[in-house]
Structure formats: C-alpha cells, structure tokens
Amino acid sequence: MSRKKSNGGLRFQPAGGNRATQIPVGKKQRLLIERVAGDGRGIAFIEGRTWFVSGALGGEEVEARVLGARGKVVEARLERVFQASPERREAPCRHYARCGGCNLQHLPHDGQLALKQRLLAEQLQRVAGVQPEEWAAPLCGPEFGYRRRARVAVRWDVKQRQLDVGFRAEASQDIVAIDDCPVLVQPLQAIMRHLPTVLRSLSKPQTLGHVELFSGTAEAVLVRHVAALPAEDLARLEAFCREAGAQLWLQGEGDPAPVDAAQRLGFALEPWGMELAWRPGDFVQVNAQVNTLMIQQALAWLAPQAHERVLDLFCGLGNFALPLARQAREVVAVEGVQAMVERAEANAHGNNVYNARFFQADLSQPLAGAEWVAEGFSAVLLDPPRDGAYEVVQGIARLGAKRLVYVSCNPATLARDTQVLVGQGYRLKRAGILDMFPQTAHVEAMALFEAG
C-alpha cells in the first residue's frame, strides 16, 4: 500500500487500485469510545475504520483530531469531551495536554491499576488460554515523584535561533518546553527547573545533542554533545552542577565519562545493605521503590533455600542475582553483554558476594551447549527485555527447575512464553502487575510457574 500526501492530508492507494477515502490530518470527528486499548488509547469504530484516540476513556463521547491514518486505522488525539466517563479526572500536570511522556494522567491511579490488570489478564487468556491460579495484589509506589532517570530533548532551532529544551510531544518530533515534571524524583525536579535556562545561556548551544538526568546514590547530569564544548560553556555547566549538588558527565563520540574521574554513580538496595555501581547507558529500573518491592516479591515467590542453586537469566548489573545470593547456595547469572557481566561481577565483589558466578551468553538463542546448563537448578528467574525469552523458555524444563519467576515488561511476550511453559508442564501459579510506570499505560508484570 503506497502513501501519498495531498492538500496537507494523507491519501492511500490500495494495491488493487481502488482509492481509499482520504482522511486528512487535522480533521475532527465525533466518536463514541467503546473501550481502552492496551496502549492506553480509546478505541472507536466508524465507517469501517478503527480509531485510536489518546486521552479518551471507555464510554465517552468525544471529538478527536486526526494525527495520521493508514488503511483502516486512524490515530487521533482527544480535542473535546461531550460526555465524560465518571472515572475521568483533571490531569495533575499542566503540560499533559501536549507532552508525550505520560498518557494516563486523566485516569485516577486506581483506574490505571485496574486497566493494567485487565490488559494482562486478556493477553494471558487470548494467547496462552490460561489464567493464574491466584492473582497477586499490584505492587505500587508513589504515583508521582518516582522516576529516577529521564532524557531531556534538546534541539537548536536554526530559523528562530533559539534552543528548544523539554520533552517530545506525542507522536511527534516537536519539543514541548518544560521546566518541571511531577513524575521525576524531587532531586531531578530541582535540576529540571533551572536546566533550560542554563543550556540556553551557553555560547554554543548548537553543539548539544541531548541531556540525561540520573538520581541514585548521587545525582548526575549527562550532556551529549556533537562538537567540542567551548571552555566557557564547560565551566558554566560545571558551576551549575556544583550548585545543584550533581555530577557532570559528558559524552562525545565515545562512552559517557564524568568530568571528575573520581566520581561514581550507584543505586542502593537498602533491605539487603547493598549498593550497585552503574553508568549512564546501563539498564536500571527507573522506579526505585517498586524495584525494591519487585525484588522482595521475586525472592518470596522463588523461596530459594540455603542448599539450592538458582539461575538468573538477563541478570543486568545483578539487581536480582545479588539479593538471591544472600539466600541460595549459589547463583549463576547470565547476561548478553560482556561489559554488563563485568560490572555485575564487580558489584558482587563490592558487596562481598562470592557465591554468584556470571557468564556472557546470547540469550536470543537456545540454551543448549552453554557450560552452565548441565549443572541443574532448583529455581530460575528471568527478566528479559520487551522481546521476551521465547528461545530460552523452549528448553527451560531440561534445567530441572521446580519454580520459575518471570519478570516481564511486555504482557504480549509474557503470554506467548507462558504458552510455551505451560506446554512443558509448568502451571501458572501466580501473577500480578508491577506499577513501575504510573501515569503511563506501560505494563510490567511478574508470574510464578511451578513444575507439575
């Protein structure tokens, strides 16, 4: 199907040659929203097309403006509510109407949790044909002030000769000017309030790529630049970070590095008295409170005993592996990136953990042949990326594990992998959502499988 522009809108030419009715960008349409989709958008049906409307709730009568269309699918943004859902609330953030960072602030937190629970249950039923024997209560932290890392968009506007600083608009490369964000942790909110002014004051702002903010055992500002920073601009950034009590990191063509080579970043796992080192670019859960609850629940569900060996797949920096090692006889932890394996090993030694072994392996391939596979395990923990762990779970039963905890950031791939595990004789004993990203439709979940 080819796509053509016409009169500021979109025109589609089906392969058969019959021209589809034009749906111009910007067109407004009155709609009745039937339900909410998995990505948090309202769904409506009219004239043979499916409309996805961001900002709309089930049962509402709304007016929506077209953002784009393709075939029988139209993407739109809420413009006006004629008949509101009783669940609707005024979004707490003043930037919500334009910023693309959050998409569920118009729904109270209890409603967000119910939506995510429903989406997980629907995926498990539709794809795997199962429901858990028991639903666990959602794991929740604060609905605002939770995010400990953020990427700030920066772009030099050649025509206006000004620096745009903020977050991306929904479904757009436009930058919404923002100097406050209520989902950030308080230390990052304080930095964000002054960051745009500082960046715009630089003598060569066009050298900037983007900026990342981090909060853990210390705060950090990472400035990515496409050309060398003038000395005066570097001095200005250093002064800003000193005043904010934050580290300054820079990244040009190489890896990120602190301006002060002695500085380090880390995050605490307080219940276990641990501190894990990490660097900008490493994966780390953005929600510290829910991360702690998640680890505690995973350990409770796996219940590793002092004589047991546990396998941790997609181990990252050791977020699960190190607490697991406090309870199990031995933990074998596997990660796909060698640099992460080395940092996880360093984290283990830095926390006096010596019963965890770390290996690099391509976990997009079947496990057969790896040196650690033949050793056998009592329990397995998986924390894969959005693609899931399809190749890994194909042979998971051969490891001999009686208990398996699967931490998922994508209900669709969790459901797909659940079907495989059930086919190998595992029961879906328990499942529940992890509210890692309040105010968004992003669903994280944990599932416990037991053999037999």
Curated annotation (Swiss-Prot):
Span list, region Disordered: 1-23
Enzyme class: transferase
Keywords: 4Fe-4S, Iron, Iron-sulfur, Metal-binding, Methyltransferase, rRNA processing, S-adenosyl-L-methionine, Transferase
Domain of life (superkingdom): Bacteria
Reactions catalysed, as given in the entry: uridine(1939) in 23S rRNA + S-adenosyl-L-methionine = 5-methyluridine(1939) in 23S rRNA + S-adenosyl-L-homocysteine + H(+)
CDD domains: AdoMet_MTases
Residues the record marks as active site: 409
Sequence positions that bind S-adenosyl-L-methionine: 285, 314, 319, 335, 362, 383
TRAM domain segment(s): 22-80
GO BP of this protein: rRNA base methylation
Single GO term (MF): 4 iron, 4 sulfur cluster binding
Binding site for [4Fe-4S] cluster: 93, 99, 102, 181
The enzyme's E.C. designation: 2.1.1.190
Record-stated family: Belongs to the class I-like SAM-binding methyltransferase superfamily. RNA M5U methyltransferase family. RlmD subfamily.
Role according to the record: Catalyzes the formation of 5-methyl-uridine at position 1939 (m5U1939) in 23S rRNA.
Stated name of the protein: 23S rRNA (uracil(1939)-C(5))-methyltransferase RlmD
Organism: Pseudomonas entomophila (strain L48)
